[in-house]
Amino acid sequence: MEKDFWQGVREALPTALGYISIGLACGVVASPYLSPLEMALMSVLVYAGAAQFAMISLIAAHSSILNMALTVCLINLRNMLMSLHTSSDFKDASLAQTIGIGSLLTDESYGVYLSEKLKTDTITVPWMHGNNLVGYVAWIGATVIGTALGSLLPDPKAFGLDFALVAMFIGIFAAQFQGMQLTEKTKTMLMLMVLLAVAVSFFLLLFFVSQPLAVLAATLIGCFVGVVCDARE
């Protein structure tokens, strides 16, 4: 039975709660520099948690627009590989549908997508739109509210909001790791190979680049290894 839009929404609701927590924190951090309207425009057009936190830091440092653009591009390079892998399930979708899916794909919605893939081989376009849109709406609303109420919550770390994104990733990964028991041995080996590629790449890159760049580069290498190995099966 094919799953519809609202089933995609329901599958993504737990991650939407994480979006709200980290979105509020992002809004609070941005409140000294951006108005709620400006924050809304940033969330609508950029829609990338890590990139938006980086942009806010650069705005606070009076950095150039070119520097901000390059930073956002570097941080979001991994989305290209995630979109490339996701597109394999939507080869019959229209151009507008694939652009819509790729534009709103995030680490979290990609994680929900992978978890769903452990249960079924059929992912529909409406389901994916539901998965993506619930996070999009939650993020925009949370960042705007956080910016508006920023003066009331001057230190988001005091409430542990800065850990919300990390906790969300842990939850998504735990669900996928548990799902390994339901997959064939080759899929389990693929997941372990990707994790190994990320770990080895990270430690080797530390000898040549800074830690933040090593994290980004290792993530991209892991995504590339996963896409290539998955395509060969």
Residue spans for each PLM region:
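Alpha-helical transmembrane segments and their membrane-interface exit regions
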Residues: 48-51, 74-81, 167-174, 218-231
